A protein has these predicted regions:
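Hydrophobic alpha-helical segments
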Residues: 1-92
């Protein structure tokens, strides 16, 4: 299977750099998912807009991460499990 590598920050489009800096500021690092989406700044923007919209729902951060962990488990996504385990720990 072909893999798309994460872009080093310096190689990302200027339009994506501001968004990636916001992610770095919020999380303390830039997860590979976002660095990979930066290949297509419109995809990164769309993903972040969706995440932001879902974050405004009635579920708190802890409940959202429980759902994300369950979904990751069902889908067999080891990367997603690792990422959402980290975010679940941060959410409490």
């Amino acid at each position: 299977m072909t893999r798309i590598t994460a872009l080093p920050f310096e190689q990302t489009a200027t339009s994506a750099q501001a968004q990636l800096e916001g992610i770095r500021k919020g999380l303390g690092f830039i997860p590979n998912t976002f660095a990979t989406l930066a290949h297509a700044p419109a995809a990164l923007s769309g993903y972040l807009a969706l995440s932001q919209a879902l974050g405004k729902g009635t579920l708190n951060a802890k409940a959202r991460e429980v759902v994300a962990l369950a979904s990751s488990q069902v889908n067999g996504c080891e990367y997603c499990l690792a990422a959402h385990s980290l975010f679940a720990d941060k959410a409490g």
